C-alpha cells in the first residue's frame, strides 16, 4: 500500500478549509434570509393596522342615514335654524322645509290673506336627514312633544317640537313625493281654470240672451204690438169665484120707527 505524501495531505486540508468557508457563507446567507423573514411580520402588523383603520372608515361611511319628519315648523324658523338646533344631537346631512304657499301645500284662501312681514320664513313642515339612523330614532323619541328651550328671550323658547322618525324612508322618496304633489297641484289648477272658464262662458251667454230679449221687447213696443210681458202676467194671474152681494130686507121694527118719525115730523 502506498502512504499519502505530505503534499497530498496539505491539499486535502486546504480543500476541507474551503468547504468549511463555503458552508459558513451558506449558513450566513440562510441566517440573513431568516432574519429578513422574521422582520417581515413587523411590516405586516403596520399593514394590518392600516387595514383596520380603513375598515373603520368604511364602517363610518356605510352608516345608513335616518330621516326625521317635523310636522309643524314654528313660525319664522328657517331651515338654517333647524339645522343648527338639530346639529346639537348628531351629524346632519340634508334639510328641507316646505313653504306655506308651496305647490304641495296650496291653500285657496291664502289669496285673500294679507302678506305677513316675514313671509319668506313661513314654513309648515320639514325633513331632517341624520347620517346615523340610530341617532335619528333617539332624537325623534326624545324631542317629540318637548319644549324647544334655549336662552331667556329666545323666540322659540316656549314652542314645542312635533316630530317622528320615518322608518324605511329615503331622501329620494321625498323628491318623488314633492314632484307628485306639484303635479297634483297643477292638475287642480287646470281643473279650476277650466271650471272658471265654463262658468264665465255660461254667464256671457245668459247676458247676451238677455240683451236680445230686451231688444225684441223694445222693437215690439215701438211697433205697438203686445209686449211679451202681458201674456206672461195673464198666465200667472189667478182667478177666484166671487159671490154676489145680497141686500138684506128691512125689518118691521125699522119700518115702525120710520112711520112714527114721519108722523111726528110730517
Swiss-Prot record:
Q: Where is the composition biased (Low complexity)?
A: 221-231
**Its domain of life?**
Eukaryota
Keyword RNA-binding recorded? yes
Query: Cellular location of this protein?
Result: Nucleus, Nucleolus
Q: Looking at the record, which segments are called Disordered?
A: 1-74, 215-259
Report one GO cellular component.
Answer: nucleolus
RRM domain mapped to chain residues: 66-160
Q: What is its main location?
A: nucleus
In the record, biological process GO terms are: endonucleolytic cleavage in 5'-ETS of tricistronic rRNA transcript (SSU-rRNA, 5.8S rRNA, LSU-rRNA); endonucleolytic cleavage in ITS1 to separate SSU-rRNA from 5.8S rRNA and LSU-rRNA from tricistronic rRNA transcript (SSU-rRNA, 5.8S rRNA, LSU-rRNA); endonucleolytic cleavage to generate mature 5'-end of SSU-rRNA from (SSU-rRNA, 5.8S rRNA, LSU-rRNA); small-subunit processome assembly
GO molecular function terms listed in the Swiss-Prot or TrEMBL record:
RNA binding
Composition bias type Polar residues, residue spans = 22-42
Q: Which UniProt keywords apply?
A: Nucleus, Ribosome biogenesis, RNA-binding, rRNA processing
Function recorded in the entry: Involved in the small subunit (SSU) processome assembly and function, and in the 18S rRNA synthesis. Required for the early cleavages at sites A0, A1 and A2.
The family assignment reads: Belongs to the ESF2/ABP1 family.
Protein name per Swiss-Prot or TrEMBL = Pre-rRNA-processing protein ESF2
Report the source organism.
Cryptococcus neoformans var. neoformans serotype D (strain JEC21 / ATCC MYA-565)
Amino acid at each position: 500500500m502506498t502512504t499519502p505524501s505530505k503534499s497530498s495531505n496539505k491539499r486535502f486540508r486546504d480543500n476541507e478549509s474551503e468547504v468549511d468557508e463555503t458552508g459558513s457563507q451558506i449558513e450566513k446567507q440562510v441566517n440573513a434570509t431568516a432574519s429578513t423573514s422574521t422582520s417581515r411580520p413587523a411590516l405586516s402588523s403596520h399593514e394590518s393596522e392600516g387595514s383596520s383603520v380603513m375598515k373603520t372608515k368604511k364602517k363610518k361611511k356605510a352608516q345608513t342615514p335616518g330621516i326625521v319628519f317635523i310636522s309643524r315648523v314654528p313660525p319664522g324658523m328657517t331651515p338654517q335654524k333647524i339645522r343648527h338646533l338639530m346639529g346639537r344631537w348628531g351629524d346632519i346631512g340634508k334639510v328641507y322645509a316646505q313653504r306655506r304657499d308651496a305647490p304641495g301645500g296650496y291653500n285657496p284662501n291664502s289669496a285673500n290673506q294679507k302678506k305677513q312681514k316675514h313671509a319668506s320664513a313661513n314654513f309648515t313642515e320639514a325633513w331632517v336627514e341624520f347620517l346615523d339612523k340610530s341617532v335619528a330614532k333617539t332624537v325623534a323619541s326624545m324631542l317629540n312633544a318637548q319644549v324647544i328651550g334655549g336662552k331667556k328671550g329666545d323666540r322659540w323658547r316656549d314652542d314645542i317640537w312635533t316630530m317622528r322618525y320615518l322608518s324605511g324612508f329615503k331622501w329620494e322618496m321625498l323628491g318623488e313625493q314633492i314632484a307628485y304633489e306639484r303635479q297634483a297641484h297643477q292638475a287642480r289648477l287646470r281643473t279650476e281654470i277650466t271650471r272658471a272658464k265654463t262658468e264665465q262662458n255660461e254667464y256671457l251667454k245668459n247676458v247676451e240672451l238677455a240683451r236680445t230679449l230686451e231688444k225684441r221687447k223694445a222693437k215690439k213696443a215701438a211697433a205697438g204690438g203686445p209686449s211679451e210681458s202681458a201674456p206672461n202676467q195673464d198666465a200667472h194671474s189667478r182667478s177666484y169665484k166671487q159671490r154676489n152681494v145680497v141686500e138684506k130686507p128691512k125689518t118691521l121694527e125699522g119700518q115702525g120707527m120710520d112711520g112714527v118719525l114721519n108722523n111726528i115730523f110730517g
